[in-house]
Amino acid sequence: MSTLDKNLLLEMFRKMEEIRRMDLKIAQLVKKGKVPGMTHFSVGEEAANVGAMLALNEDDLITSNHRGHGQAIAKGIDLNGMMAEILGKYTGTCKGKGGSMHIADLDAGNLGANGIVGGGMGIAVGAALTQQMKNTGKIVVCFFGDGATNEGVFHEAVNMASIWNLPVIFYCINNGYGISADIKEMTNVKHIHERSAAYGIPGMFIEDGNNVIDVYEGFKKAVDHVRSGKGPVLIESVTYRWLGHSSSDPGKYRTREEVDMWKEKDPIENLRKYLVENKIASAEELEEIQAQVKEAVETSVKFAEESPFPPLESAFEDIYAD
């Protein structure tokens, strides 16, 4: 049994519930035509996001990717502001200009999601260089999917971070598919983290990315390594997205049997069973958390729907940095 604190375990459960319920609610709003632009959901990948994020200090920084809802929530974004942003409202965290794929929350240390595959990697290296030069003690985590590891910027970013011994973790959430392309067709290495050897940095493998405790404990080792000044780490966590690549993808390249098999590994249900069976938390405690999260999500929808769209003059705001 894990020695992790009960409060931490309950926070894991709460954050995963927030991600699941927010994404499913957003999916409903997409079908109603209320969400402009593309959306990419994190359903099924909750543990891979939450376990990693809770291993960080609150003031550490991240860069996200197009499938960034889970990362934003795990990093502590205000749910009202997030929902408003996704609906394109002026009360959103980016005043409605970012939407689903470009959501950012600088107050929480989220430097932003990115619609360009691998687009956050150079930003993460730059942010890590800043922390090193200013001696802040903060580290940066760059979130990306398996498909991004075949982009040229992956090589450039990891190589530069290695040369300069930067405080950055490159975190690959491997869900097995780059849109519809099976990872086995895209690379000859068995595991993506093995590529770390080419850059002279450690590679870490979290085989069960649906086990939030495994993710947390594995990630904590990487965090300690980087924060102690030993340089970057490449981590790979294996998980699975239940839904299509995006809101427009029916996922016909996967079999129903494959999806159902992974749903049996539901990260939230796995943690719920663990907490109850080991008498860490009662079923009633967890149901109360679920009820609180459900209410918070409904409140976020009400807030977003009642919020105004950006005024025309706001198009000329935020063009230059202060």
For every predicted segment, state its role.
Residues 24-27, 34-164, 182-188, 193, ...:
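Cofactor-binding active-site loop characterized by glycine-rich and histidine/acidic residues
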Residues 14-30:
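N-terminal glycine-rich anion-binding loops that anchor highly charged ligand groups
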Residues 1-11:
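Charged, compositionally biased N-terminal leader segments and the immediate start
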Residues 177-181, 201-207, 252-260, 285:
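Short beta-alpha connecting loops at secondary-structure transitions
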Residues 70, 176-179, 241-243:
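Short gly/pro/ser/thr-enriched loop/turn and capping motifs at secondary-structure boundaries
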Residues 166-170, 202:
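Short, proline-centered helix/strand-breaking motifs
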Residues 225-322:
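Glycine/aspartate-rich loop-and-adjacent alpha/beta segment that forms the canonical ThDP
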Residues 132-136, 188-221, 264-289:
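Conserved thiamine diphosphate
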